[in-house]
Amino acid sequence: MGKKKKEKLSVAREIDGMEEKVALCKYNLDVIDVKLRKMELTEEGRKSLEKEKSSLSSRLSNYERELKSLRHENRKNMLLSVAIFLLFAVGYYCWTL
C-alpha cells in the first residue's frame, strides 16, 4: 500500500513531506542533545537517549539521501518539461512562418 500512496503523490509533494520529516528529525536530535548535556541522567537513561540519538541520526541520513534523490528526479522532470515546451515553441514558430 505504501507504493500506491507514493505513486499518487507528485514529486514536489514528496519533497515537501520529506523536508518535514528531515526538520522533525533535526528538532528531535536537538532535543536529545539538550537532554544529554543539561540533564543529570542515570547510566541507563543516558544509554537509552544515546541509542535513540543514533537511531534518529541514521533515520535522518536516510531521509536526506531520499530527499537528494527526489530533488534529482524533480530536476529531471523540470528539464523534460522545458524540452517539451521548447519543442512545441519551435513547432509553432515553424508552422506560423
UniProtKB/Swiss-Prot annotation:
GO cellular component terms, A-Z = membrane
Keyword Transmembrane belongs to the record: yes
Tree of life domain: Eukaryota
Transmembrane spans: 78-95
> What's its membrane topology?
Single-pass membrane protein
Q: Where in the cell is it found?
A: Membrane
Q: Name one Pfam family in it.
A: CCDC-167
Name the keywords, alphabetized.
Answer: Coiled coil, Membrane, Transmembrane, Transmembrane helix
Membrane recorded as keyword: yes
Which intervals of the chain form a coiled coil?
Answer: 36-80
What is this protein identified as?
Coiled-coil domain-containing protein 167
State the organism named in the record.
Xenopus tropicalis
